[in-house]
C-alpha cells in the first residue's frame, strides 16, 4: 500500500471559497464526502467536502458537538473516516498504512487547548523534543528551539518548567513546539479557549504570522469575536455538517 488512493469523487467535489479558487497551487487538504460515525446514532461528521490551500488561515466554527475536533483528528490520522476520502499533503489518510502515519505527522503541527506540555521537562526541552524525535543533530536542535522560543518571546525563560509559566505563556510554548519543525500544516483546536482577551490576541497573532509565512492553518474556535477580528475564511459546522463556507472579510 503506498498511502495514495484515487482522488476523483463519484459526486461533486470539495467546496471552494472564492479566496481558495484564487489561490495558486494544489490544495494541501482535500476532503471528498467524508463521514465519521462512532456507532449507531453517533455520527460526528456527515458528507463533508472541502479543500484548503497553502498559506490559508481557516477558522472552524460551531457549537460543541459540531464536528470540529473530529475533523482535526481525521486530518492528522488520529481517526479514520467511516466514508469518503481525505487527502492531506497528497496522502490518502483513509488508506494510509500505520507505518506511514509518522511521516505524515512530522509535517503537521498540532496545538491543543490544554497545552499537553511535559511538566517534568524545561520549556526548551519541550520544544526541542519535536526535533529530537526526528533525529536532528544536537546543535541544530538547540539553535532551532532557541530561535522559536525567541519568536514567541520566551527565550529568557527557556530553562524553567511549564508550571512556572502562566496559561498564556504555556500556550506560546505549545505553539513554538508545533511550529519548530516548520510544518506544512498547523491544526489548532481551541488554542485560546482558556485565555483572556489580551492573551487570545497574542496567540492568534502568532498563528496568523505562521500562515503569512506559508503554513496552512486551521483553527477550531467558539469565539465569534475572534473570527470577526481576523476576518478569515470560516467553515461553519453544526451537527457534523458543513453549513457555510464563508470567505474572509465577509463576516
Language-model-derived ranges and their functions:
Residues 76:
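Helix-to-loop junction immediately C-terminal to a conserved catalytic motif
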Residues 84-92, 104, 144:
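Conserved ABC transporter NBD signature motif
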Residues 93-109, 138, 212:
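ABC ATPase NBD coupling module
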Residues 121-129:
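Short coil-to-helix segment of the ABC ATPase nucleotide-binding domain corresponding to the Q-loop/switch region
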Residues 161-165, 169-171:
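Conserved ABC ATPase signature
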Residues 182:
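Conserved catalytic motifs of ABC-family nucleotide-binding domains
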Residues 186-189:
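Catalytic Walker B motif of ABC-type/P-loop ATPase nucleotide-binding domains
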Amino acid at each position: 500500500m503506498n498511502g495514495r488512493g484515487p482522488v476523483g469523487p463519484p459526486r461533486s467535489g470539495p467546496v471552494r471559497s472564492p479566496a481558495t479558487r484564487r489561490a495558486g497551487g494544489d490544495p494541501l487538504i482535500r476532503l471528498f464526502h467524508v463521514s465519521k460515525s462512532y456507532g449507531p446514532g453517533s455520527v460526528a461528521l456527515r458528507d463533508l467536502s472541502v479543500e484548503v490551500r497553502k498559506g490559508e488561515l481557516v477558522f472552524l466554527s460551531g457549537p460543541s458537538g459540531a464536528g470540529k475536533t473530529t475533523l482535526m483528528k481525521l486530518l492528522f490520522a488520529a481517526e479514520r473516516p467511516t466514508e469518503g476520502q481525505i487527502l492531506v499533503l497528497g496522502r490518502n489518510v483513509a488508506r494510509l498504512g500505520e507505518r506511514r502515519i509518522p511521516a505524515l505527522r512530522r509535517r503537521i503541527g498540532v496545538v491543543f487547548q490544554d497545552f499537553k506540555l511535559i511538566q517534568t521537562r524545561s520549556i526548551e526541552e519541550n520544544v526541542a523534543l519535536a526535533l529530537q524525535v526526528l533525529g536532528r543533530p544536537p546543535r541544530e536542535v538547540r539553535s532551532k528551539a532557541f530561535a522559536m522560543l525567541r519568536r514567541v518571546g520566551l527565550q529568557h525563560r527557556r530553562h524553567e518548567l511549564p508550571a512556572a509559566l502562566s496559561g498564556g505563556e504555556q500556550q506560546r510554548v505549545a505553539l513554538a513546539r508545533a511550529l519548530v519543525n516548520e510544518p506544512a500544516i498547523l491544526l489548532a483546536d481551541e488554542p485560546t479557549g482558556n485565555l483572556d482577551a489580551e492573551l487570545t490576541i497574542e496567540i492568534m497573532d502568532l498563528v496568523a504570522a505562521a500562515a503569512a509565512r506559508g503554513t496552512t492553518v486551521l483553527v477550531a474556535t467558539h469565539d465569534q469575536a475572534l473570527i470577526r477580528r481576523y476576518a478569515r475564511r470560516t467553515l461553519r459546522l453544526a451537527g457534523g455538517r458543513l453549513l457555510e463556507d464563508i470567505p474572509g472579510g465577509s463576516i
